[in-house]
Amino acid sequence: MSKKRVLTGVTTTGIPHLGNYVGAIRPAVRAAQNLDTESFLFLADYHGIIKCHEPEMIHQSTQAVAATWLACGLDPERTTFYRQSDTPEVMELNWILTCITAKGLMNRAHAYKAAVQANAENGQEDPDFGVEMGLFSYPILMTADILMFNANEVPVGRDQIQHVEMARDIAGRFNHRFRELFTLPEVKIDENVELLVGLDGRKMSKSYGNTIPLWENDKKTQKSVNKIITNMKEPGEPKQPDESPLFEIYKAFSTPSETVEFTKMLADGLAWGEAKKLLAAKINAELAEPRERYNELTADPSQIEEILQAGAAKARKEARELLDKVRDAVGIRPLK
């Protein structure tokens, strides 16, 4: 029985925070340990430059994201871990797929439609004002990322479902027009994946400014946790889990029995200040070893580069084999 292929891409436009760890990194690392799964994880730096035009940010984020995944337990021996820009076969496939993709399909992409709508609301006569081709056609690049390794499943958030559906559409069009070479990928949505709340109770997000950094030291983590909003109840007054986002964050770092005990402590009047100390201790305990590893990797980025180059060599070997078949299918062949 062949293994199921799962492919995940991570953009390189920021430094991962605690919400990324709980919602994406931790579950993905655990899933990659499944013996029935063949995992591919890539740093989507070409996707990153679609919106981010700051070279140093792209460069620094690539290092930080790679170090984060490795520090959090990603095993490059079990997962093909590579940088998108190190696999030129993906970009060649991107062009071939661009040549068979209907413009109307791209017109329906959510990101493009949102840009057009924003222009209309702002009174712009040109609906495409400010729209660059990277934004317009990036679903095709995402399709190339997926099809290059014939992934069976692509874990995505609900806002990304459309892109996997587009990948299926484009793969089907190629298979029908030329040759059956591509697997039709399936969306994978894990309903049990936690969406961590931030300091203010909304989803933890850089755009909200409510994040808890992942790689700060113990004291700074405590300072961040101290900013979690709470009500004015005094020590000794009973408190309910839904009265502060603190409880949901605590739950993400605790066993079910520990969560039950914490609920009881709140009901018995645990002071918010003490509750925050308990939470910070939980976070710091789980991240102690990953933080040490992260600091080692970022102090010597050549370690990261070596791992990425090894992953790229592995990825390219496989990509080349499929791309040769694709080129042959569309008529790009040696002259004999």
From Swiss-Prot:
Catalytic activity: tRNA(Trp) + L-tryptophan + ATP = L-tryptophyl-tRNA(Trp) + AMP + diphosphate + H(+)
Bilayer-spanning residue ranges: none
Superkingdom of this protein's organism: Bacteria
UniProt EC number: 6.1.1.2
Binding site for ATP: T11, T12, T13, G19, N20, G157, R158, D159, L196, K203, M204, S205, K206, S207
Motif 'HIGH' region per UniProt: ranges: 12-20
InterPro entries the UniProt entry points to: aa-tRNA-synth_Ic, Rossmann-like_a/b/a_fold, Trp-tRNA-ligase, Trp-tRNA-ligase_bac-type, Trp-tRNA_synthetase
MF GO annotations: ATP binding; tryptophan-tRNA ligase activity
Keyword set, alphabetical order: Aminoacyl-tRNA synthetase, ATP-binding, Cytoplasm, Ligase, Nucleotide-binding, Protein biosynthesis
A Gene Ontology biological process term: tryptophanyl-tRNA aminoacylation
SUPFAM superfamilies according to UniProt: Nucleotidylyl transferase (SSF52374)
Any one Pfam family match given in the protein's UniProt record, by short name: tRNA-synt_1b
Residues spanned by motif 'KMSKS' region: 203-207
A Gene Ontology term for the protein's cellular component: cytosol
Principal cellular location given in the protein's record: cytoplasm
UniProt-annotated binding residues for L-tryptophan: D145
Location in or out of the cell: Cytoplasm
HAMAP family listed in its UniProt record: Trp_tRNA_synth_B
Function: Catalyzes the attachment of tryptophan to tRNA(Trp).
Family assignment from sequence similarity: Belongs to the class-I aminoacyl-tRNA synthetase family.
Subunit structure: Homodimer.
UniProt protein name: Tryptophan--tRNA ligase
Phylogenetic lineage: Bacteria, Pseudomonadati, Pseudomonadota, Betaproteobacteria, Neisseriales
Gene label: trpS
